[in-house]
Amino acid sequence: MVDNLEPLPASLQNLVEQDSLKWIFVGGKGGVGKTTCSSSLAVQLAKVRESVLIISTDPAHNISDAFDQKFTKVPTKVNGFDNLFAMEIDPNAGLNELPEEYFEGENEALRVSKGVMQEMINALPGIDEAMSYAEVMKLVKGMNFSVVVFDTAPTGHTLRLIAFPQVVEKGLGKLLRLKMKVAPLLTQFASMLGMADVNVDTLSQKLDDMLRVITQVNEQFKNPDQTTFVCVCIAEFFSLYETERLIQELTKCGIDVHNIIVNQLLFLNNSHSACKMCASRYKIQEKYLDQIADLYEDFHVTKLPLLEKEVRGPDSIKAFSENLMTPYDPKAKPKE
């Protein structure tokens, strides 16, 4: 009976048309074209959403190369778009590595308090980078983007990023529970350094606000109406193996995943004889495409071509992004 089911549409149209989505993660094994796919998805979303943000969490920060434009840790408008923004963050960075834009509007007392608290945070392993992540998410949430696309690092780092909201929630909760014990020590420490304006209550309120944002993000990440994950792979054994492992881990974490992109595929033209290597690669890819069809019959599987030229710059990404919406046709003439 299952064999009679129609395969799901081979595109990302289902994601682009799902207005409730707030967070879309794009990830997979290194070297499969995640950045090209995430950038292309962001471009398509920008056509139908009011404002779109793409965030690179990969230390390699390839979205600057993809759009041929330098991005920073603060959302920057992408050239050629009115409603598409990009930023690059290091999820392993600490609070002191965040730019001043993250702390605009805070009084000097809170800035001093943050510096003192930083010393204490350093004594709690993992809390520093967790709070840095919390600051980033608070900034992103405050800007009210319609949807946020994450261009993630290779699989291991991605799973850690997905779990970060839970880590932050626990870490901030621990800090707040220690508040009564920390407050006198913080005041005394500040006094010894001649910092009379340290306001523990203000800093505590900031932690409360941060915890509230992260708790909300954590809930949204596990809501399939608001969050989903797109797996990118190529038709080879190791990539397929990594994809299956990623899907299993995402399922354990309660993260929705029902889209797979198979990138860098050969589409042989029957009117021309293929070289021996191309014919061999084509057979290998066909074998793994059959396996993908069997394993993921309830997934949207989008097939993207291996191109002669690299996809770089806004115009190239715009053209390539059409393949996410309409299955690639090797006979169709490329758009100029």
From Swiss-Prot:
Indicate the residues that form the catalytic site: D58
Residues given in the record as ATP binding sites: K29, G30, G31, V32, G33, K34, T35, T36, E236, N263
Which InterPro entries does this one have?
Anion-transp_ATPase-like_dom, ATPase_ArsA/GET3, ATPase_ArsA/GET3_euk, P-loop_NTPase
The EC number(s) this enzyme carries: 3.6.-.-
Q: Does the keyword Cytoplasm apply?
A: yes
SUPFAM superfamilies annotated for this entry? Answer: P-loop containing nucleoside triphosphate hydrolases (SSF52540)
Q: Which GO terms describe its molecular function?
A: ATP binding; ATP hydrolysis activity; metal ion binding
Task: Name the residues that bind Zn(2+).
Answer: C275, C278
Q: What is its main location?
A: cytoplasm
Q: Which GO terms describe its biological process?
A: tail-anchored membrane protein insertion into ER membrane
Subcellular location per the Swiss-Prot or TrEMBL entry: Cytoplasm; Endoplasmic reticulum
UniProt entry tagged with the keyword Signal: no
Top EC class per UniProt?
hydrolase
Annotated keywords: ATP-binding, Cytoplasm, Endoplasmic reticulum, Hydrolase, Metal-binding, Nucleotide-binding, Transport, Zinc
Family named by the database record: Belongs to the arsA ATPase family.
Q: What does this protein do?
A: ATPase required for the post-translational delivery of tail-anchored (TA) proteins to the endoplasmic reticulum. Recognizes and selectively binds the transmembrane domain of TA proteins in the cytosol. This complex then targets to the endoplasmic reticulum by membrane-bound receptors, where the tail-anchored protein is released for insertion. This process is regulated by ATP binding and hydrolysis. ATP binding drives the homodimer towards the closed dimer state, facilitating recognition of newly synthesized TA membrane proteins. ATP hydrolysis is required for insertion.
> PANTHER family of this UniProt entry?
ARSENICAL PUMP-DRIVING ATPASE ARSENITE-TRANSLOCATING ATPASE, ATPASE GET3
Output this protein's name. Answer: ATPase ASNA1 homolog
The major lineage groups are:
Eukaryota, Metazoa, Ecdysozoa, Arthropoda, Hexapoda
